[in-house]
Design a protein with these regions (language model features):
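Intein/HINT protein-splicing elements and their conserved insertion hotspots or analogous self-processing inserts
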Residues: 1-122, 132-215
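Short hydrophobic/aromatic beta-strand micro-patches
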Residues: 127-131
C-alpha cells in the first residue's frame, strides 16, 4: 500500500486563483478479478445506498464503514455486485449520474430519501448495483436504503426527469473554455505521400560466437 499527499499553497491560471488546498490519498493493491467498475450495467437492477452515519461532532462512524466494506468485499467475490462507487462531493444524485454515464443507463429514484439528502455530502457512503432479489438481502444491513431502479436513458427524481446525455454534456463541458476536449475543425486536405518500395531484409544463417569474458 501507499499513503501520500500534496499541499498546493498557490496557483493561478489567467484570472482564476486556486485557494490553498490540502490533498491526501491512499492506495492499496488488490486483485483485478475482485475489482468492480462504477458504470451501471443492467436494466432492472437496483441501486442501493450503504450509508455512512456520523457522530455528534460530524465525524464518520468508522466501525460502520468497516462493516460495510467487509460485507461488500465478500459480495464482490461472490459475483453479486455489478457496479459500485463511493459517494463523492455533490451527494447521491451526482454520484449516481456519474455511474449512469458509462453505459447511458438512467435511474428512477424512489422516495426513500428526502430531496435535500440526494445532494448532501455522504463521505464514506457507497452506491451499489445489484439484482432486486439481492437488494432485499442487502437492505438488511444497517444504514442501507434501496434508492431506485436502473433503466431507461434518463435520471428521474422527485418528478423531475433529465436525459443522461444532457447531464453528460453539461458535466464534460464545464472546463471546455479553459481546457477544450476537442481540437478545432481545420479544413485541410491530407497530403498525398509518395509510394515507397519495401526494403528486403537479410538474415545471417550461421551461428555467432558468444564470448564468455570481455577484457
Amino acid at each position: 500500500g501507499a499513503i501520500g499527499g500534496k499541499d498546493s499553497m498557490s496557483g493561478t491560471f489567467n484570472d482564476i486563483h486556486v485557494p490553498p488546498t490540502l490533498v491526501s490519498f491512499a492506495v492499496a493493491p488488490g486483485k483485478a478479478s475482485e475489482a468492480v467498475s462504477q458504470e451501471l450495467k443492467k436494466e432492472g437492477d437496483v441501486l442501493i445506498l450503504f450509508g455512512q452515519p456520523k457522530d455528534e461532532a460530524g465525524m464518520p462512524l468508522l466501525d460502520v464503514f468497516k462493516a460495510h466494506a467487509d460485507f461488500l468485499y465478500q459480495e464482490v467475490k461472490a459475483g453479486h455486485i455489478a457496479a459500485m462507487k463511493a459517494v463523492e462531493h455533490g451527494g447521491v444524485a451526482v454520484t449516481a449520474a456519474k455511474m449512469a454515464f458509462g453505459n447511458k443507463l438512467g435511474v428512477t429514484f424512489g422516495e426513500n430519501l428526502p430531496l435535500f439528502k440526494y445532494f448532501s455530502n455522504f463521505y464514506g457512503a457507497i452506491l451499489v448495483e445489484t439484482t432486486p432479489e439481492l437488494a432485499e438481502e442487502f437492505a438488511k444491513q444497517p444504514h442501507t436504503k434501496i434508492l431506485g431502479t436502473i433503466g431507461g436513458d434518463s435520471m428521474k427524481l422527485c418528478g423531475e426527469e433529465i436525459a443522461v446525455e444532457e447531464l453528460l454534456r453539461s458535466y464534460e463541458g464545464t472546463l471546455d473554455p479553459i481546457f477544450p476536449r476537442r481540437a478545432a475543425d481545420i479544413q485541410k486536405e491530407a497530403p498525398i505521400l509518395p509510394e515507397t518500395k519495401a526494403i528486403p531484409q537479410f538474415y545471417v544463417h550461421t551461428n555467432l560466437s558468444r564470448p564468455r569474458v570481455f577484457i
